[in-house]
Amino acid sequence: MKLGIIPYQEGTDIVYKNALQGQQEGKRPNLPQMEATHQIKSSVQGTSYEFVRTEDIPLNRRHFVYRPCSANPFFTILGYGCTEYPFDHSGMSVMDRSEGLSISRDGNDLVSVPDQYGWRTARSDVCIKEGMTYWEVEVIRGGNKKFADGVNNKENADDSVDEVQSGIYEKMHKQVNDTPHLRFGVCRREASLEAPVGFDVYGYGIRDISLESIHEGKLNCVLENGSPLKEGDKIGFLLSLPSIHTQIKQAKEFTKRRIFALNSHMDTMNEPWREDAENGPSRKKLKQETTNKEFQRALLEDIEYNDVVRDQIAIRYKNQLFFEATDYVKTTKPEYYSSDKRERQDYYQLEDSYLAIFQNGKYLGKAFENLKPLLPPFSELQYNEKFYLGYWQHGEARDESNDKNTTSAKKKKQQQKKKKGLILRNKYVNNNKLGYYPTISCFNGGTARIISEEDKLEYLDQIRSAYCVDGNSKVNTLDTLYKEQIAEDIVWDIIDELEQIALQQ
């Protein structure tokens, strides 16, 4: 096993060294310890649900992500491979959620928060990268039936001054804040889990009280013929994203424009009149800014669009095995801009992408269109830029001279002349987790169930008959993508092991 990899513990780790060939049974790690938080009783179904909170496991926060892993003695160098908790199907992630949000004791499809809790959010364990995907969310506790009835009655009456003065709107506002609520939608890795989905630019959400669309914290009424949700309602989501090939083509074009803008900015900084004007500390600062821009250009030129880079390490936390990796962070606008406005507008949209909404099988419309792209360089990992910039400046030089007859002094001079910085690690990489995640946010006792299995999706056949009009169209379910995701993890585990073996030779 590679030096630095944590050793196995035969009594607790999942190791099959002594198992006979053909008798090795796959086993997933046990669920972590659970602490009971509260109970919810559905007024529609009359069923009580018990909710728990996990103990002694790390949650995804502070730009670090975790997932369970298992010992694999067939991986002689890496030693460990990806695994999942023993759930029967996809659902809400155990680790990719706010600490204040609870999950059902009996499965991973129900999420809730206790009464008097503010907004808490959880993401699904399925990453949607391309194509059309459909899922449903059932309201267990949320919405506001009284408010919905009040709105319907209000539509049949005229707004009078007396009604406004009587404080009807203030009463409605208080009623909204004192009742359970939900928000649903999709978000990216960068979205905060301590705020409702749609709070920032990385999420797209729907309100349960009015079915308003929320993005960047702004409300929009784009859905038609919808009514406020009540318990028992099922909201259908159809997310359509362009193919990975189309997204890569867009990312490449955007990278070219950013490199061109960087070069133009650097040419302006290096003009002779500016060097003469800048002296002393200002000249040193100018040189440092130029070096930083050169490093940014090197990172952009180093992007591998078709590769997956998973910089994850196995750790043992309270006698449990996890993979730890850095997560994607919120990106800031570059310090440079070209005169082409498309750098900031057209290339920040996924063409023909949308999120369509259905209420109990009834089509309400497209809540969002032209979603934000996510492949590098639109997304970037947490990155110690100062450290990697220093390595790029002072790292070992690449020996690009193939002339064996060259004298050592001349060869050394050529080597210094052709010296190039080494990029130890790039922040513009795809770790196979870039995509949009189905998301649920709960408030003040709000409770919802995500439905991902094909046989439990009540309106799936209706959706497929409407959207699969030709042989090229296909509507996936979350459970199907979940199984494909597991298969991809196995493949990339093997590829990572083979790459490490090749590096050792």
From Swiss-Prot:
It is found in: Nucleus; Chromosome, Telomere. The modification Phosphoserine is found at residue 227. Keywords: Chromosome, Nucleus, Phosphoprotein, Telomere. Signal peptide: none annotated. The keyword Lyase does not apply. GO terms for biological process: subtelomeric heterochromatin formation; telomere maintenance. SUPFAM superfamilies: Concanavalin A-like lectins/glucanases (SSF49899). Residues 271-290, 398-420 are annotated as: Disordered. Disruption phenotype: Leads to hypersensitivity to brefeldin A. GO terms for molecular function: transcription cis-regulatory region binding. Residues 409-420 have a biased composition (Basic residues). Component of the Set1C/COMPASS complex which consists of SET1(2), BRE2(2), SPP1(2), SDC1(1), SHG1(1), SWD1(1), SWD2(1), and SWD3(1). Interacts directly with SDC1. Present with 1310 molecules/cell in log phase SD medium. PANTHER family: SET1/ASH2 HISTONE METHYLTRANSFERASE COMPLEX SUBUNIT ASH2 (PTHR10598), SET1_ASH2 HISTONE METHYLTRANSFERASE COMPLEX SUBUNIT ASH2 (PTHR10598:SF0). Component of the Set1C/COMPASS complex that specifically mono-, di- and trimethylates histone H3 to form H3K4me1/2/3, which subsequently plays a role in telomere length maintenance and transcription elongation regulation. COMPASS recognizes ubiquitinated H2B on one face of the nucleosome which stimulates the methylation of H3 on the opposing face. Belongs to the cclA family. This is COMPASS component BRE2. It comes from Saccharomyces cerevisiae (strain ATCC 204508 / S288c). The gene is BRE2.
